[in-house]
Every structure is written in structure tokens, then in C-alpha cells.
Amino acid sequence: LDAAVTAAAGIGYPVMVKAAAGGGGMGMGVAVDEAALRTEYDKVRAFAERMFGDGSVLIERYFPRVRHVEVQILGLADGRVVALGERECSVQRRNQKLVEESPSPAVSPELRSRLLAAAVRAGEAVSYRNAGTVECLLDPETNEFFFLEMNTRLQVEHPVTEYVYGVDLVEEQLRVASGLAPTFDPDALAPSGHAIELRINAEDPKRFLPGPGVIRTWVEPTGEGVRVDSGYTEGNTVTPFYDSLLAKLIISGATRDEVLERAKAAVAAFQIEGPKNNVPFFAELLTNEEFLSGAYDTGIVSRMR
């Protein structure tokens, strides 16, 4: 605790108190002063020991208004590391992602160049070989970005990158593991179009509390640029024991505006009866002016609620 107090004093308040072994937004708290730090430290440490078997805690700078942007990298069999653009992941509840899109509406060509170069350097520094995600926080006022963590695996949201870059990341992982060259030209990677993923969860659309139950109706949307990844169908039981993700609704198109229009139609056509689900939330989000403008941050869901 004394080390945490010293670290926080050096960083400056407010700070984020984070479980070192945590993930998925679990094991995090914000401290605005030393008294709050002492409380949050004990709370996060106890949670981390109970959930992860490791009570180690990190103290980080906290940004009240920030965007969550991540870079998809791929460490190739020949030793090179390439970046396949960025994903915007700022629509979150309880620090867990609900929406991901690529390219990010917040990232200019100049910022993209810096962001991708930094992610590639991170991969090169550890001789990385595989698909991986370098996650960052982006200050929209200054365009400064700060390293969060690297996920050494595919992310739930990898399909949006696949659509925009025309690369099958699962296949490329297997090729790296087999010592084979990629199917694409690493020197000619360039984004084309836009893609958005909506995480359809079994949860109340207002407070996002778990909503298990038996699926009575399950009708997936179809249409140009519409894809649904799911393992559920009518008659299945959604239990409270696992992650609430029911499906990934992935929309692609030539422009962000086109994708948003397709997403509205797809959400309206997605019928799920039985367990509570967040489809109504997405219908609301897709009419929200802040989201439609692209000028949103990680606080957008709390402002909607």
C-alpha cells in the first residue's frame, strides 16, 4: 500500500487502481485522493485475490474523458511485424466493450501513422510471432496515446479488421505457426471501407444486468454487408454461469454512413425473445447524435443512462 501511495503521488490524482491479473474490465477502481486510494486499493486487491488468485495491483494515470483505441498487429514467420489498422472500442459498459469499429472516426492519417508505428515497435521489441492487439487510451484533446496492454490472441472484434483489410486473421495465424509467408503483401496493406461490430448480450438493455433464460424466438438479420456469428438458436438455454455474449452482429460497407444505415436495419430485424438482451440498446445507440458524429468517448453509455 505504501508503494501505491508513493506511485500515485508521483503520477498525480486521479489514478486508476487496477488488478494486474485482471481483464475484461474487472478489478478496477478510481481514486481521486489518498483516502480514496487506500479504500480502492484494499477493495481491488481483495477482488483480485478472489477472482484471479493474484492480488497484485497496478497504479495508472486516470483520464476522465478518453477513447479506447487498439491496433491489430501480426508477427510474421520471417520476423517482421505488421499493423492492420486500428479499431475504435470506446462504447463500453463497466469497462467492457459493446461496439467496435474500424477505422476509428477519431484517428487522422497522421495519428494513425504514429499509432501503428508504435504498435509495430512494441511487437518487434519482444520478437512477437502471432496475431496480437496493442490496446491504448487516446486523449481526444491532445491526440496523445498511452499503452494499456497487449492481448496475445485474436480479439472478439477481429472481424471488423478482416473486412476492412481483406485479410483472414485466423488463416494468417495458422500460416505463421506453420512457418509460411502471409497470403497478402505486407508492404501494401491499406484500409478499404468501414465495419462495425455490435456485441449482442443476454442482459437488461437499461442497467446491463444479466438476463438468462430459454430462447423462445431467435431470428437473425440478413442482407448485404450483414453477418452474424453465434452459437445460439431457438430452444437453447442461456445460463448465468458464463459470459453473456449471444452473438456478434458485424456490418460492413463502403463508408461509415452506409454501415450505420445497414446496422439500423439489421438491429430492427434481429428478434430475440426469452432472455433479456441489449438489442434495444443498440437501436437507441444508432440514433444517438454523439455516436453518429463519431466524436464519442468511453463515457457515452453512462451519459445515455
Describe each region flagged by the PLM.
Residues 1-27:
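A conserved helix-loop-beta module that forms one wall/lid of the active-site cleft
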Residues 19, 24, 31-305:
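ATP-dependent carboxylate activation and anion-phosphoryl transfer catalytic cores
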